[in-house]
């Protein structure tokens, strides 16, 4: 395999794992692009992005433009490196056409869906929310559009009925290096294929989307909860308080025409709520300003019997 000079652009954990794996290959990481440092937490302590941490540990130069309009000098610095290829995954900053044209083989984007399905910011969450049974990793030749570039390689992944956004994210982080290295190996001869099929868009997640609609089926609610785990978290409103849900199971029994959203039972087995077709049992709940707890531990400190028969929403 030919040794390539690579510029890497990414920011969060998934990008950092791919970068770690790329360092283990024979390719040369010339420089890394990542978002600027952020002040986080109560103490407003400045934190580096996960990608920056990996780059510094490997003594690689790091560029952190606020934007390429505000920091055009970064483009010139990258041009001087004369990279063979630029690899992008979850960078989070809009790149201009001038950036896309720098490298000999252009910019490769690692996108975690089977394009053109779920273009955009939240493909993992939207795939689970929609009840998709499969997803994948696409290595895409970046162009000026939103995830519209030609496909160079694909790895299909099954979505399990127990997958959450976190577990699927972790699978993508672990598996993304395989199709990337395959693509780099064949970069001189690989034939880009235009995206086929009807596109769909994975719009950015909002905190308010976590609210559970119990008029939906138990399966749809399962998809909703798993899609929004760990963030923003799925929840229901009880006495004007947002109660986040944790572990749950679907009880395969008829709800005897009890209205969706009705609290059927609360005991040490769980917190049972009727959906449009079945009962869903929550084994863990998180009350405001508290930790996520097993229902057994909650009942040791709270009397919830008064809510049996109560209809949510």
Swiss-Prot record:
GO molecular function, one term: methionyl-tRNA formyltransferase activity
Transferase among keywords: yes
Alphabetized InterPro entries for the sequence: Fmt (IPR005794), Formyl_trans_C (IPR005793), Formyl_trans_C_sf (IPR037022), Formyl_transf_N (IPR002376), Formyl_transf_N_sf (IPR036477), Formyl_transferase-like_C_sf (IPR011034), GART_AS (IPR001555), Met-tRNA-FMT_C (IPR044135)
Documented EC number(s): 2.1.2.9
Single GO cellular component term: cytosol
Protein family membership: Belongs to the Fmt family.
Binding site for (6S)-5,6,7,8-tetrahydrofolate: 113-116
Keyword Cytoplasm: no
Superkingdom of origin organism: Bacteria
Catalytic activity, reaction form: L-methionyl-tRNA(fMet) + (6R)-10-formyltetrahydrofolate = N-formyl-L-methionyl-tRNA(fMet) + (6S)-5,6,7,8-tetrahydrofolate + H(+)
Function: Attaches a formyl group to the free amino group of methionyl-tRNA(fMet). The formyl group appears to play a dual role in the initiator identity of N-formylmethionyl-tRNA by promoting its recognition by IF2 and preventing the misappropriation of this tRNA by the elongation apparatus.
Listed name of the protein: Methionyl-tRNA formyltransferase
Keywords: Protein biosynthesis, Transferase
EC category name: transferase
Annotated signal peptide: none
């Amino acid at each position: 395999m030919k040794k390539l000079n690579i510029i890497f652009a990414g920011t969060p954990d998934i990008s950092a794992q791919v970068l770690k794996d790329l360092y283990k290959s024979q390719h040369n990481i010339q420089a890394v692009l990542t978002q600027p440092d952020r002040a986080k937490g109560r103490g407003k302590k400045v934190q580096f992005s996960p990608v920056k941490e990996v780059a510094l540990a490997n003594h690689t130069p790091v560029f952190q433009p606020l934007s390429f309009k505000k920091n055009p000098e970064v483009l010139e610095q990258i041009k001087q490196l004369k990279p063979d290829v630029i690899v992008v995954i979850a960078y989070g900053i809009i790149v201009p056409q001038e950036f896309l044209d720098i490298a000999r083989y252009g910019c490769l984007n690692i996108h975690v869906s089977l394009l053109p399905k779920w273009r955009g910011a939240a493909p993992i969450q939207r795939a689970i929310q929609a009840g998709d049974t499969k997803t994948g990793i696409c290595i895409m030749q970046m162009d000026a559009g939103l995830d519209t570039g030609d496909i160079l390689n694909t790895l299909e992944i099954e979505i399990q009925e127990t997958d959450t956004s976190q577990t699927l994210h972790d699978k993508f982080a672990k598996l993304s290096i395989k199709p990337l290295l395959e693509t780099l190996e064949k970069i001189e001869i690989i034939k880009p294929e235009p995206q086929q099929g009807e596109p769909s868009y994975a719009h950015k997640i909002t905190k308010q989307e976590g609210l559970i609609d119990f008029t939906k089926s138990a399966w749809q609610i399962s998809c909703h909860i798993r899609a929004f785990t760990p963030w923003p978290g799925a929840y229901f409103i009880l006495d004007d308080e947002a109660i986040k849900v944790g572990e749950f199971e679907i009880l395969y029994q008829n709800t005897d025409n009890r209205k969706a959203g009705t609290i059927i039972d609360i005991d040490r087995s769980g917190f049972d709520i009727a959906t449009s077709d079945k009962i869903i049992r929550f084994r863990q709940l998180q009350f405001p300003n508290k930790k996520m707890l097993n229902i057994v531990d909650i009942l040791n400190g709270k009397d919830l019997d008064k809510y049996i028969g109560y209809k949510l929403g």
